[in-house]
Amino acid sequence: MVLDAVLARGRTVCKHNGLLILSVLSVIVGCLLGFFLRTQRLSPQEISYFQFPGELLMRMLKMLILPLVVSSLMSGLASLDAKTSSRLGILTVAYYLWTTFLAVVVGIIMVSIIHPGGAAQKETTEQSGKPVMSSADALLDLVRNMFPANLVEATFKQYRTKTTPVIKSPRGAAEEAPRRIVIYGVQEDNGSRVQNFALDLTPPPEIVYKSEPGTSDGMNVLGIVIFSATMGIMLGRMGDSGTPLVSFCQCLNESVMKIVAVAGWYFPFGIVFLIAGKILEMDDPKAVGKKLGFYAVTVVCGLVVHGLLILPLLYFLITKKNPIVFIRGVLQALLIALATSSSSATLPITFKCLLENNHIDRRIARFVLPVGATINMDGTALYEAVAAIFIAQVNNYELDFGQIITISITATAASIGAAGIPQAGLVTMVIVLTSVGLPTDDINLIIAVDWALDRFRTMINVLGDALAAGIMAHICRKDFAQDMGTEKLLPCETKPVTLQEIVAAQQNGCVKSVAEASELTLGPTCPHHIPVQVEQDEDPAAASLDHCTIEISELETNV
């Protein structure tokens, strides 16, 4: 009997969490396979062939980013009134800024305690040859990308100021330029001869940097988010005239989520090759660990403190709910973030986990997640603060309190401009370093371990987005309950739900929404705490509770 119960329990767990279990196993298998193949000395060409299944996974996820962001923001904001959408937007952005600043503070405290720069040795390297970008240009590029000049181009390119060195010619003719030649003699060791040397003291040419407009490959997610959010708000104010476009966006969003559900079974297979391929590409682990081990430990410890202590504590204090249960619901999205190191590519999976497992109101998820994937980079902000102070420690540069405050502010601002793409933090790191006068070429010191740390900080970014959706669903539950009667659902968005899912939805901000948005018929097994509305036939005598059904047209629990 006990064995049968255990087997039945195991089958139930595998049935409901099969994809999650496969994802966990794929991460373990990928690590083992990668370290085993390192002993086989594969050529770069063979490694590229080996990474092909993982490359397909990345391409599938990136393919879904654009339609998902546009459709979710436009349909989500169009279904809200102006007051509700403005309150949700203000609370979401304020929460994101606050948690990002907390992440920076945690990073500064950890790097000050561990002091990893004392164990690292700076090697004399040549100039990297990378274009120099000032912090002013980087901040202006952030603002420019918020308002793309060409919306079609924004889907595959973003604005990027290019800085090129220019030799400044002296005024006047070349012969008028000041030039001095010094001739001096040096006697040889035996004293027989004197060698004459000429030293040209012509001053070197002055080099200035010229900024020119340019572009870089990659989707301008920030500009698309701004445009889609504006369109969604305007569609909501247009009333019935904007309904066709809203319906199109809702159906597009639903179809994308169905594609995600089908493609999800390929994810464990692709994760194996993504992780194993990255392990094959990395440098000698022993040499990297000896040089940057304390730095990596500092970043990971900061991410653990912020992601597993501070963010869950905020969720518990605000919602009075168990954060472990919530985090378990988005565990698959965290594993995809670990494999892809891209919060934007993980966006479809995060949607799926929040709607199916945590039963978050889909309108909140449609707004909070795309915005969070663009501006909420807690892990990136923490990493940039740690890296900046680490570089200062390597150079024996003492930072005063004012410079630490400058780092905290610039790291918070720079993380907002970091697109949800792999290793975007290295680009915005220039802003943080130049704000306190640190050499930007020293970014090369941390590149060796950035590929691994990028995956862990992406997990924290995705976790912060998911917890933010849960917190906003709790804070704005009354606003959405009052606004529930104004939303019209498409047939493609109505699905049957169980009583357990109704109770779970009530706990995530839908206390009155089930009754107010739906036409419910009282059934014999319906809990008494769920407000219902009895729908009777024309003949009262023919009405029987045994033939009544429950129809829920509001709650969406399966994608």
UniProtKB/Swiss-Prot annotation:
The protein's matches in Gene3D superfamilies, at most eight in alphabetical order, are given as: Sodium:dicarboxylate symporter
Q: Which GO terms describe its biological process?
A: chloride transmembrane transport; L-glutamate transmembrane transport; monoatomic anion transmembrane transport
A single GO molecular function, which one? Answer: L-glutamate transmembrane transporter activity
Keyword Manganese included in the entry's annotation: no
This protein's UniProt keywords: Cell membrane, Glycoprotein, Membrane, Symport, Synapse, Transmembrane, Transmembrane helix, Transport
Tell me the residue ranges located in the Cytoplasmic compartment per UniProt. 1-16
An example Gene Ontology cellular component term from the record?
axon terminus
Q: Which family does the record assign?
A: Belongs to the dicarboxylate/amino acid:cation symporter (DAACS) (TC 2.A.23) family. SLC1A7 subfamily.
Function, in words? Sodium-dependent, high-affinity amino acid transporter that mediates the uptake of L-glutamate and also L-aspartate and D-aspartate. Functions as a symporter that transports one amino acid molecule together with two or three Na(+) ions and one proton, in parallel with the counter-transport of one K(+) ion. Acts primarily as an inhibitory glutamate-gated chloride channel being a major inhibitory presynaptic receptor at mammalian rod bipolar cell axon terminals. Glutamate binding gates a large Cl(-) conductance that mediates inhibition, affecting visual processing in the retina.
Q: What is this protein called?
A: Excitatory amino acid transporter 5
Tell me the gene name: Slc1a7
